[in-house]
């Protein structure tokens, strides 16, 4: 939702504080929720799988997941003995549009009959991203050319030339390069049906922050003087995180509770924003998250789990653009999820009570929030494996420290942001209906949903300026979200040794505030159609993805044009039925289209990457 070096997921039009990003059940413990230019500390090429959580089950992980959660599963803490003396996975890849060079490897080694040692590492480096046309949107180019004309008329030809140069920038996105590396080590103890493990990890990245061309703002120096900054100045972020994790899964026998699951994560996170060669603003966050969950043995048709969760975050920022004061957030929660099956009907219920304390020490402000969330789901198992379901929910979210206490220039959003220490809890009532299952040999999923928000928290432009930046305030107003999602995967040909599959996907969401204005950054309708041929040695896939334009915008947004992406991929398994070696060749955005995602804060000056050829090899032994 921001740029190549820093992006977060968008689920059903929700992002930021309303979508929780997890690593094996606990938070990533970075500060990506505080600003869209702050990266998540997850290296994609070391991920084993990704789960998108919605419905009653999401209440196990926090009221912040009011819009859903993304749970990233990796292998840093081993939970089973390898089948061989050691197991090695390796990956290497390159691409053309960003000059990507990347590699990763992980190794699991059995020690005796009960211990497993794991180590993994990765490295990734890119250059500036190439694009198929102008960097700036037509609206922003027109604005800069008008400013250039004004500067020329005022007798400032050098500044006019700078504006014209920025408006004419095309072919690549300056300062969009990045480099990152990770190193993780873990140890797992397997004792029958119980497992224990711990891991240590290091994440290090450096990436460019892409500023809006032509931006200027002033900030006060320590001595009280004001220094003017040009938006074209190169800004980079150097980010480091040390992380320690523990995981336990204890088998309790055949009583009421089958097992006890323990999970703890500790993070020491620092990132520094460099303005040229000078240190600008430093963000530091130390956090601990711990959870204990008791899983019930199935009693008849009843199963479930209950637990407790604790969250502690100590956040500190210092520098000219430390727009959030030092703050401490503590949360304690209890939760339960219960499932009851009666014949073809399954009932699922979840509840979560959460107690949050947010304190800004330097301001002398402390806020307490007690929130309760609940969800109820009903699923009917129809004929031939088709499932029909409906979920209802009521969720509450305490305001974040950033929403409460922000007060300063935030260059990532091109705004001077002002929080409100008197914000109330945000409440959402949700209703979701779905049908999913099989159609012959194919599968489908159709979902319709609606969410009614009370006290929805959002940024609103005030019409004022501070430090040459527009002033935005965090406000609250009721809001209404609704949308539909559809997926179909069907084999057109299914014979021994050859399959031809089709994929069809559609997604649409609409949202508006109680006063009838649009909620900002809502994605438009998107459609995807694909054909995929599969043989013993080859997979060949071609897809077309279309994004509608978005003209339902707020006063401070610009409309976004529609665009179409055409992609292709070939995967070759030289050992045929053996999956140990896979070579991939891919082409993304074949027609070099300039596309802009409306959900992005920076879509007017950070378009999608242009035509990109990728090659990779994956080994597993």
Protein language model regions, located:
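Gram-negative outer-membrane beta-barrel transporters
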Residues: 302-304, 445-453, 470-552, 594
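Flexible loop and strand-edge segments within Gram-negative outer membrane beta-barrel domains
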Residues: 174-180, 193-259, 266-289, 320-321, ...
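Short acidic/polar hinge/loop motifs at secondary-structure boundaries
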Residues: 27-56
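C-terminal beta-signal and adjacent terminal beta-strands/loops
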Residues: 396, 449, 454, 572-621
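Outer membrane beta-barrel strand-and-loop segments of large Gram-negative receptors
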Residues: 287-294, 333, 418-424, 430, ...
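Extracytoplasmic beta-strand/coil segments of soluble accessory domains associated
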Residues: 1-30, 48
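N-terminal periplasmic accessory domains that precede
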Residues: 7-10, 22, 37-43, 52, ...
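Transmembrane beta-barrel wall of Gram-negative outer-membrane proteins
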Residues: 98-125, 136-207, 238-253, 257, ...
